[in-house]
């Protein structure tokens, strides 16, 4: 138990994927606001004693955390709740292949945690290290399936309705818990919106990079500049600097890396609380509550620049979109509400 825990208050051990993990800190603040004593722990360190262990992402190896919980006597195990935020393999892949590859990838990753020395040596022999450097999304699924089968993972949620439904369809009781907006991610700074269009984040792959450049060229032909915070032209933006920049920005571009990508969710909840409008290409209905034309602007890839130009020329429409999105993410789809749903996931008897 944390030395700062107070008697009678439920305890939650909350994972941190880095020494400075802003997402974990935001979730921890919401848990504290809901009346929980929060015990942060690094993902590669011992899991502290608590009534509940809460993990998310993952941004590294998750299996050792589940293994620590699983090695405890059944009567002493905490509830282990995991909130998937890192996506899924291509959903066109047949489920038996997703599950089979996922379990195999998870098993390979877990070799280094085995008690037998020969198994740990096997983890260092080719081609195991090379295999462990790929197929991450399969590993995420495989870890979840193996931990649920063993009874260690008592609550599984995903930020995508689509992915949660895939789990349930195949016999795994995953729940949809949407991402939410934290109060520390937005402010009304009443600044002049002197930036027309913003791109923030990594380009990641050729598909996304090419489309960003295309939209940028087409806007430039009409005298509109795109502010680039891509880690190349300008540094990535975080915290107060990001909030300030979003308060100066009218529109933020969203471009997928893959056709099934769910990244819009995180961009939307970062942007909308600052009354900045997201302009996006179409994406899968990961969260049905988001409505194109109601909370964000949408256009096919080849029409994104034209949609941006239209909104810049019709300021009343842009402001109305911004206000509806702001109300959604600050009153209904907050991080507090998401964490409340997450921590209340049913624990099997």
Q: What do the predicted segments below correspond to?
A:
Residues 300-317:
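C-terminal "capping" alpha-helix adjacent to the active site of nucleotide-linked donor transferases
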Residues 2-51, 55-76, 82-269, 273-292, ...:
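Nucleotide-sugar donor-binding catalytic core of glycosyltransferases
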Residues 152, 267, 307, 324-325:
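Short, hydrophobic/aromatic alpha-helical segments in well-folded domains
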Residues 312-346:
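A charged, aromatic-enriched C-terminal amphipathic alpha-helix characteristic of glycosyltransferases
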């Amino acid at each position: 138990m944390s030395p700062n825990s107070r008697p009678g208050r439920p305890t939650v051990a909350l994972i941190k994927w880095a020494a400075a993990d802003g997402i974990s800190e935001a979730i921890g603040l919401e848990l504290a606001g809901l009346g929980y004593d929060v015990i942060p722990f690094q993902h590669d360190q011992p899991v502290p004693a608590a009534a509940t262990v809460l993990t998310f992402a993952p941004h590294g190896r998750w299996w050792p955390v589940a293994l620590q919980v699983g090695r405890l006597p059944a009567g002493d195990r905490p509830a282990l709740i995991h909130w998937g935020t890192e996506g899924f393999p291509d959903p066109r892949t047949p489920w038996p292949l997703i599950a089979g590859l996922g379990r195999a990838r998870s098993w390979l990753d877990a070799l280094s945690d085995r008690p037998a020395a020969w198994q740990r040596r096997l983890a260092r022999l080719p081609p195991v290290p090379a295999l462990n450097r790929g197929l991450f999304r399969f590993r995420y699924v495989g870890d979840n399936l193996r931990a649920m089968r063993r009874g260690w993972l008592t609550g599984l949620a995903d930020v995508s309705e689509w992915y949660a439904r895939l789990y349930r369809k195949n016999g795994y009781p995953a729940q949809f818990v949407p991402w939410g907006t934290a109060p520390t991610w937005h402010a009304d700074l009443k600044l002049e919106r002197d930036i027309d269009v913003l791109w923030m984040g990594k380009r990641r792959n050729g598909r996304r990079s090419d489309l960003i450049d295309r939209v940028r060229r087409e806007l430039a032909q009409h005298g509109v500049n795109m502010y680039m915070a891509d880690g190349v032209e300008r540094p990535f933006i975080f915290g107060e600097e990001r909030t300030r920049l979003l308060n100066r920005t009218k529109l933020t571009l969203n471009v997928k890396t893959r056709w099934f990508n769910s990244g819009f969710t995180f961009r939307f909840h970062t942007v909308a609380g600052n009354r900045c409008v997201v302009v996006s290409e179409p994406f899968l209905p990961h969260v049905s509550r988001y409505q194109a034309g109601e909370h964000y602007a949408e256009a096919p890839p080849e029409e994104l620049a034209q949609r941006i130009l239209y909104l810049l020329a019709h300021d009343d429409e842009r402001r109305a979109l911004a206000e509806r999105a702001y109300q959604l993410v600050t009153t209904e789809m907050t991080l507090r509400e998401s964490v409340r749903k997450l921590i209340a996931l049913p624990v099997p008897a």
